[in-house]
Amino acid sequence: MEPAFWHKRWADNQIGFHQLQVNPYLQAHWPALGLAVGAQVLVPLCGKSLDLLWLAAQGYRVLGVELSRRAVEDFFVEHGLVAEVSRRGAFEVWRCGEIELWCGDIFALNAEDVAGCTGLYDRAALIALPPRMRERYMALLDDLPAIGKGLLVTLDYDQSLIDGPPFSVGDGEVRAGFSGWQVDEVEGREILDESPKFLKAGVERLLERAYSVRR
């Protein structure tokens, strides 16, 4: 999954993964994590998600990481926010109030960059990555010791019937990748009837799961 793939998706406005409302799992299950108000939350591969605004509105500081500059720029423009832009290492950092979006490759992050992040929210990062990149991504999260609590959303389906993204990430893979964490499935829902692309491909089950992760 090369960066050019995602740059083209954004350039062509092929962003079906972008949700037009705040994620219901986030609203339902984030409060139960008990993350202190004022804490900083890492949101990998954040796009221009409305979830960023929701987290900030709950009193959290938000650090999103996004490869596409188009997505970052669109986020601020579409919400009438004026960002200060600076550089930090390999990243272009856009900041307005309690929201920072770091434009660059997620794998260029290190523990020092996100030392202030104690929370994690991943709705569309893990499922955006093919298997080997998922391994790298989960290893990266494991190497960010400040992060202690988070919410993760996945999809589980027969990958042989249709190519990702979004990719299928089964329960076993989540628990293996987060082996040093306490992993609890907090909600699971069958969403095949809402997903014409998967129905057309002959997929018979499309399970969306939300997990809390803690360590």
Describe the residue ranges of each PLM region.
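Short beta->alpha connector loops
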Residues: C46-K48, P131-R132
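Class I (Rossmann-like) S-adenosyl-L-methionine-dependent methyltransferase catalytic domain
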Residues: M1-V37, K48-L52, G64-I99, C103-D113, ...
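Class I SAM-dependent methyltransferase "Motif I" SAM/SAH-binding loop
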Residues: L42-G47, L55, A125
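A short SAM/SAH-binding and catalytic strip from SAM-dependent methyltransferases
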Residues: I106-L109, T118-M133
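Conserved S-adenosyl-L-methionine
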Residues: A57-R61
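Extended hydrophobic secondary-structure segments that form protein cores and membrane-embedded regions
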Residues: V41-P44, L101-C103, L120
